[in-house]
């Protein structure tokens, strides 16, 4: 994930200089190189190298796509687009395992790599043929200007608050992802049913992201982010206090707790991301990269620290989500005070 973000940052430096579509093509070309290495690998280490290069290449198009959205949209419309994209993106952990199993049922495992190549080829051709270049040549910037814009992002207090909130909530999400498999396998003993539980949880995040894309234009990104951060704080705090007093975990309760928490996330993530990047329409590509890198760094610090305290029970997840939601609520509702200072 760190490499993915660093490559995204580097790609957006090039993106700001060579254009959006050229940057996507460069990143996808590196991804294809990784695919072919995997396809013709004859050892595990070569296969891992190929996967490494795949991640290296795909980091750029991911961030550039966010920049394209910011080039075309702003404000609540941008938040709506981001939420819709997330609702589709969240379907990946639900559909991908089933798709992979289907390919393996009929073909050899290397056909999964063939599918990667064909799918990326189709999507890249669609982008190149149907999406016009959104960064005109006269707006492309030099390396020295990029350094200046980096300082511009860091000095924007409003965006930095939204970035901090994104990082905290993403940290809570990554904490769950890091320990959910041993938790469900060892503590709840779900065995082969784990993918089903994970799919149900992910579907709640995807559904709420889709609903947010429908209603953000009506209520506004700021209002929705604040309302659902408040609800998330109340929900996680109540459950944390209950578990501190009773320390009684069961599968149904924990799954419901996570599903409701993730449904609140769907109304927050897309809006915060749109609010963070909104002031930087003139440097959308690079700003998107910086926002992604900073929020991921915060998230990795949070999830890495929290995961070290994992004791085999769900308490670490509940505690981390509660602390992160309280911190996010505090930052969002005291934002004006920080800005005045």
Regions found by a protein language model. Give the residues of each.
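Juxtamembrane intracellular "pre-TM" segments in multi-pass secondary transporters
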Residues: 132-163
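Helix-breaking motifs and short loop linkers at transmembrane-helix boundaries and internal kinks
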Residues: 19, 40-46, 57, 242-243
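Cytoplasmic helix-loop-helix junction between adjacent transmembrane helices
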Residues: 44, 50-91
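Paired small-residue
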Residues: 30-37, 45-53, 252-258
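Single conserved hydrophobic/aromatic residue that forms the stacking wall/gate
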Residues: 1-13
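A late C-terminal transmembrane helix in Major Facilitator Superfamily
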Residues: 273-312, 320-321
